[in-house]
C-alpha cells in the first residue's frame, strides 16, 4: 500500500519451548486421520442417512489429520480438528440408530481420542517466551488446550463481516486514508494525543433489579463517543444502533464506603449472567468486600447492533471498526472512573479485565490518571495478530490481494495499542496474569505487555484461557495489587489458596 508505515512488531517472538514438545506428539495426527476414515467408511456402509450424518466430522477429521502429518500446520488446523472431534462426539449418539451401537461407540471413542490428540498437537506448536514456566503435559491440560482451540474456532466462524470482495476493498481504502490522516496529526508518533478527553458522567440512569437472590443495579448512559471528524469509518460507526448506550451492572455494599473494582469482560461476553460467572461476586464482592461495576464493552451484549452474536465485529479484520472499538471502550471507562470518583465518592478505584477486557484496562492504565491500580488477565493486547493468525484463509488472502498485511493493521491500531502507550498507573500498582497454555490469547501477549510495562508483578498459572481468577495464582497477584493500592487491608485474604 502506497505510503504504508512500517511498524515494528512489539510482540516478544520467542522460540518454542523445547520442554513442551515430544517428537512422538507429531504422530498424534494419526488419531484424527484414522477416526475420520472410520467415520467415512462406516457411514458409506450404512446408507444415505449415515452418510449425511458422518460426512462433515469424517471429512474434517481426515483432512486435518492428513494436514498435521503431511503439510505445514497452523492454528486453523487445530481449530477445525477440535471442531470435528466435538461434532464427532455429539453425532456419535444419533449414529446408534443409523450405524449401530458398536459402530457408534467406536466413533465416539475415536472422536474423544481425536479431541485429546488435538490438545497435544496444539501444545507441540505452542509458542512461549523462555521466562514463562513450562506447562504440565498431562491429558487434563491437553484437553484444556483443545477446548481453547474449539472456542477460537467458534469465535472466528461467527465473526462478521467476512472481509472479502468489496469489504476488503473498503478496508484497504479506509486504511490508506487513515494512514495519511494519522501521519498528518502525529497520532502514530504520539498515540496518546489521538484520544479526546470525555465529558463528565454526572447523571446516569440507575435502576435496581433482582437477579438470583442478588440486588443488582443497572446503570445506563449515553456514551457521546464519536470518531474524529475526518476519520474513515466514522459514519458507519455512528450508524450502529444500540452501541451508543452504555450499560453496566453494579454490586455495592450499603453499609459503608468501599473500594470500587471495574470488571471488564472479554470478547463475546457482555450479558449479566456471563459477567457474574466470569467475575465471581462471591469472591470479589463478598469475600474481598469490594464494590463491583461491570460495564459492557462497545458492540457487545445489549450494545451489539445485530443483537444475535455479541461482539461479532470485534475480531473481523475490519480495521477501523476494531480501532473505534478500542477508542470508545477507553472513553466509556474513563467516564465511569470520573463518575465513581466525583459522584459516588469512591475512595479508591481499580480495574480488572479478562482477555479483550484485559486489553481495555491496559489501555485505560495508559490514559487515566485517576485509576489506582490495574490487573490485566490474559490480556489480548495485539488484536491484529489474533485476527491474522486465526481468521479464515479466504479473509486473509482477500486482504493480502488488496495490499493489507498483518503489519498494516498493527500499525493502524497503534493509537489504541497498550504496547505503544506509556502506563500512568504506578509500577507497583499494575499487574498481569495469564495461563501458560492459553490458546486463545497466547502467553506471548501477556509477556509483551509485561516487558512494555517495565516488568511489574506477573503470575502464570497452569491452565488455559477460561480459568482466569479461578486460578490461585491469579487471585494472589490480584490481592497483592489491591493491597498495594490500599484497596484491601493487609489482613484481608480471599480464597487465593484455593484453585478451582
Language-model segments: residues:
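Conserved alpha/beta-hydrolase "acid-adjacent" motif
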Residues: 439-445, 470
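Catalytic histidine-centered segment of alpha/beta-hydrolase-like enzymes
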Residues: 464-475
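Alpha/beta-hydrolase fold nucleophile elbow
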Residues: 344-355
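Cap/lid segment of the alpha/beta-hydrolase catalytic domain
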Residues: 265-328
Amino acid at each position: 500500500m502506497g505510503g504504508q508505515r512500517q511498524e515494528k512488531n512489539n510482540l516478544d517472538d520467542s522460540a518454542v519451548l523445547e520442554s513442551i514438545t515430544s517428537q512422538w506428539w507429531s504422530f498424534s495426527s494419526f488419531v484424527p486421520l484414522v477416526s475420520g476414515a472410520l467415520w467415512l467408511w462406516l457411514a458409506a456402509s450404512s446408507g444415505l442417512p449415515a452418510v449425511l450424518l458422518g460426512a462433515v466430522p469424517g471429512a474434517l477429521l481426515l483432512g486435518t489429520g492428513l494436514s498435521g502429518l503431511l503439510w505445514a500446520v497452523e492454528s486453523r488446523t487445530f481449530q477445525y480438528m477440535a471442531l470435528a472431534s466435538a461434532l464427532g462426539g455429539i453425532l456419535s449418539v444419533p449414529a446408534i440408530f443409523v450405524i449401530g451401537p458398536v459402530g457408534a461407540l467406536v466413533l465416539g471413542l475415536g472422536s474423544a481420542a481425536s479431541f485429546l490428540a488435538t490438545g497435544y498437537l496444539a501444545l507441540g506448536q505452542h509458542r512461549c517466551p523462555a521466562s514463562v514456566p513450562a506447562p504440565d503435559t498431562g491429558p487434563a491440560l491437553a484437553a484444556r488446550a483443545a477446548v481453547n482451540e474449539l472456542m477460537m474456532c467458534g469465535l472466528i466462524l461467527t465473526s462478521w463481516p467476512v472481509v472479502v470482495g468489496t469489504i476488503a476493498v473498503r478496508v484497504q481504502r479506509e486504511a490508506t486514508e487513515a494512514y495519511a490522516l494519522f501521519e498528518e496529526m502525529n497520532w502514530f508518533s504520539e498515540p496518546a494525543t489521538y484520544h479526546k478527553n470525555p465529558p463528565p458522567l454526572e447523571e446516569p440512569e440507575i435502576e435496581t433489579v433482582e437477579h438470583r437472590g442478588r440486588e443488582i443495579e443497572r446503570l445506563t448512559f449515553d456514551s457521546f463517543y464519536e470518531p474524529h471528524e475526518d476519520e474513515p469509518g466514522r459514519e458507519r460507526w455512528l450508524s450502529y444502533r444500540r452501541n451508543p448506550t452504555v450499560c453496566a451492572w453494579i454490586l455495592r455494599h450499603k453499609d459503608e464506603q468501599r473500594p470500587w473494582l471495574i470488571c471488564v469482560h472479554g470478547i463475546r461476553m457482555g450479558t449479566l449472567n456471563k459477567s457474574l460467572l466470569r467475575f465471581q461476586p462471591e469472591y470479589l464482592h463478598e469475600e474481598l468486600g469490594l464494590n463491583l461495576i461491570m460495564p459492557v464493552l462497545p458492540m457487545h451484549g445489549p450494545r451489539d447492533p445485530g443483537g444475535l452474536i455479541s461482539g461479532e465485529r470485534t475480531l473481523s479484520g475490519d480495521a477501523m471498526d476494531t480501532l473505534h472499538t478500542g477508542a470508545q471502550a477507553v472513553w466509556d471507562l474513563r467516564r465511569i472512573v470520573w463518575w465513581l470518583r466525583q459522584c459516588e465518592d469512591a475512595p479508591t478505584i481499580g480495574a480488572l479485565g479478562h482477555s479483550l477486557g484485559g486489553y481495555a484496562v491496559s489501555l485505560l492504565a495508559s490514559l487515566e490518571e485517576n485509576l489506582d491500580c490495574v490487573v490485566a488477565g490474559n490480556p489480548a493486547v495485539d488484536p491484529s495478530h489474533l485476527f491474522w493468525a486465526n481468521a479464515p484463509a479466504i479473509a486473509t488472502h482477500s486482504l493480502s490481494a488488496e495490499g493489507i498485511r498483518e503489519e498494516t493493521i498493527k500499525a493502524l491500531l497503534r493509537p489504541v495499542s497498550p504496547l505503544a502507550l506509556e502506563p500512568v498507573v504506578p509500577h507497583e500498582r499494575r499487574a498481569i496474569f495469564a495461563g501458560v497454555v492459553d490458546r486463545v490469547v497466547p502467553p506471548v501477549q501477556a509477556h509483551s505487555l509485561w516487558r512494555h510495562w517495565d516488568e511489574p508483578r506477573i503470575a502464570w498459572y497452569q491452565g488455559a484461557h477460561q480459568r482466569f481468577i479461578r486460578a490461585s495464582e491469579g487471585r494472589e497477584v490480584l490481592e497483592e495489587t489491591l493491597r498495594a493500592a490500599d484497596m484491601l487491608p493487609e489482613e484481608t485474604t480471599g480464597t487465593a489458596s484455593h484453585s478451582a
